[in-house]
Regions:
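Sec-dependent signal peptide recognition
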Residues: 2-10
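C-terminal motif of bacterial Sec signal peptides marking the signal peptidase cleavage site
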Residues: 13-16
Length: 113
């Protein structure tokens, strides 16, 4: 029950913050204002988010090869298969989704630990 409540609260927070100030189309800005709430400002979530929600560490070298722009874009648009990550299509513009996907997929993103 606690996990469900935590998922609901985090999901609501993400959606509430899902439109970056000024409608930014900069991938880093979108990540900082939307994704960082769960994944952390550098893509490395805190231990609580990992333990309680299974939030992925986007800087994990084992995960990085799977984080193509197309994969990240699909995750952002449709959410995760287990529904812990909410779908943000409609909350973010198409341009914002593509920008954040390119940002996360960029080789420069991983060293941001």
């Amino acid at each position: 029950m606690h996990r469900l409540l935590l998922v609901a609260v985090v999901g609501a927070a993400v959606i509430a913050c899902s439109k970056p100030a000024g409608g930014s189309t900069d991938g880093a800005a979108v990540f900082g204002s939307v994704c960082a709430a769960c994944h952390g400002p550098t893509g490395k979530p805190d231990a609580t988010m990992v333990a309680r929600l299974g939030v992925k560490d986007l800087t994990d070298p084992a995960l990085r090869p799977t984080l193509t722009a197309a994969h990240v874009e699909a995750q952002v648009r449709h959410g995760s298969a287990n529904k812990l990550m909410p779908a943000l299509e409609g909350a973010l513009t198409d341009v914002q989704i593509k920008a954040v996907a390119a940002h996360v997929a960029s080789p420069a993103f991983a060293p941001m630990r």
